[in-house]
């Protein structure tokens, strides 16, 4: 591909130098518009058709979809543009200055995962777009680190249906084909406070929560008995009761109690199914104490994800890398992209470096990642 792009390391440097933090704290949260425009300019310069879309319900956040080649199917290479915030006191380098030392590239987003776009652009130097028989898409999303709003919106609104997708999260170039989902909720009981000398004049929220927890533990057993997937180390959905707070003094009837819990569902269990099971489990408490129990989301939920084990994407990637696909415990945008086409999570850098001070990617990943991207484009866009 004829290119007027900067060298690989300069692409990387520019990506890292462009802050794109997403955070639930509005004081730390930033727009990714500058970074999206940077990517859109580069892909546009080398002949891609580029669309930049605002993500509804966000504060100045954008997705970018770049396409080259015509027809149906093809390959989608995807990644998120945002990073987590950084702890200034724990970094020994400037997070926004790409620093090379001891065969490592340091900077916020080097591994997770802005650098992936530099790898894609670099691999495209060897691709002749006139030889593509199917389209190549590149997706850059917003807010993966917080709400996954970018990937959700894209999966719900796009018309494209590639043959397959690869999300370039840092997996140390080990292909990942499944992970559990995550749903976290606050269960809040509103009681009636009063002096402990006369329990009849109050409603003790801790006692009601005790009832609620007993029903939740029954649900935990139900999840274990009803759902099973042997590819996971723990082959059933898990439930954790992680935080509880209620009351303020030994001599007062507790007026309010709140429990924070999570469920990690298997692939195939919908978020609506989980919501229904949770509401059904707590219904006896709600019915006995009308208006006193509420369930709310702590974080936007993420479904489980599994790429079909017999799909060509898996066999091609396993053969190229000489390694088998893996199952992981963390969550990605894969369940949303998977609604469009079979999806693998596969990229350079280690997940151990993600969200860490002095985040880095080992330069040993550069050559094999470039080769892998070229090979998958050849496999899925030339045939």
From Swiss-Prot:
Zn(2+) 1 binds at residues 80, 112, 169. The active site is at residues 82, 144. Zn(2+) 2 binds at residues 112, 145, 355. It holds the Pfam family M20_dimer. Its cofactor is Zn(2+); Co(2+); glutathione. It is found in: Cytoplasm. Disulfide bonds: none annotated. It catalyses: N(2)-acetyl-L-ornithine + H2O = L-ornithine + acetate. GO terms for cellular component: cytoplasm. Catalyzes the hydrolysis of the amide bond of N(2)-acetylated L-amino acids. Cleaves the acetyl group from N-acetyl-L-ornithine to form L-ornithine, an intermediate in L-arginine biosynthesis pathway, and a branchpoint in the synthesis of polyamines. This is Acetylornithine deacetylase. The lineage of its organism: Bacteria, Pseudomonadati, Pseudomonadota, Gammaproteobacteria, Enterobacterales. The gene is argE.
């Amino acid at each position: 591909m004829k290119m007027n792009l900067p060298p690989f390391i300069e692409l990387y440097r520019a990506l890292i130098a462009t802050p794109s933090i997403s955070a639930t704290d509005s004081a730390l949260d930033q727009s990714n518009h500058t970074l999206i425009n940077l990517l859109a300019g580069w892909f546009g310069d080398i002949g891609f058709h580029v669309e930049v879309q605002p993500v509804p319900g966000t504060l100045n956040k954008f997705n970018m979809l770049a396409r080259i080649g015509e027809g149906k199917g093809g390959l989608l290479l995807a990644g998120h543009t945002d990073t987590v915030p950084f702890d200034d006191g724990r970094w020994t380098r400037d997070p926004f200055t790409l620093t090379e030392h001891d065969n490592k590239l340091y900077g916020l987003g080097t591994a997770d995962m802005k650098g992936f776009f530099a790898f894609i652009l670099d691999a495209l130097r060897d691709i002749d777009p006139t030889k593509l028989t199917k389209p190549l898409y590149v997706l850059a999303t917003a807010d993966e680190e917080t709400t996954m709003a970018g990937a959700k919106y894209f999966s719900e609104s796009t018309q494209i249906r590639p043959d397959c997708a690869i999300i370039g999260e840092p997996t140390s170039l080990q292909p990942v084909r499944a992970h559990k989902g995550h749903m976290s909720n606050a269960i809040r009981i509103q009681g009636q406070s009063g002096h402990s000398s006369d329990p009849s004049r109050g409603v003790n929220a801790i006692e009601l929560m005790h009832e609620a927890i007993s029903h939740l533990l029954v649900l935990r057993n139900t999840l274990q008995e009803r759902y099973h997937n042997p590819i996971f180390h723990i082959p059933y959905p898990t439930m954790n009761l992680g935080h509880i707070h209620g009351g303020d003094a030994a001599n007062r009837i507790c007026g309010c109690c709140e429990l924070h819990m999570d469920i990690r569902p298997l692939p195939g269990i919908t978020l609506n199914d989980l919501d229904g099971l949770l509401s059904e489990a707590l219904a006896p408490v709600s019915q006995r104490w009308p208006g006193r129990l509420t369930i709310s989301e702590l974080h936007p939920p993420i479904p489980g994800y599994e790429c079909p084990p017999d799909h060509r994407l898996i066999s091609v990637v396993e053969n190229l890398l000489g390694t088998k696909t893996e199952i992981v415990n963390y969550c990605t945008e894969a369940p949303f992209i998977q609604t469009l086409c079979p999806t693998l999570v596969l990229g350079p850098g280690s997940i151990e470096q993600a969200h860490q001070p002095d985040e880095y990617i080992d330069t040993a990943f550069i050559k094999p990642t470039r080769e892998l991207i070229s090979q998958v484009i050849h496999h899925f866009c030339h045939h």
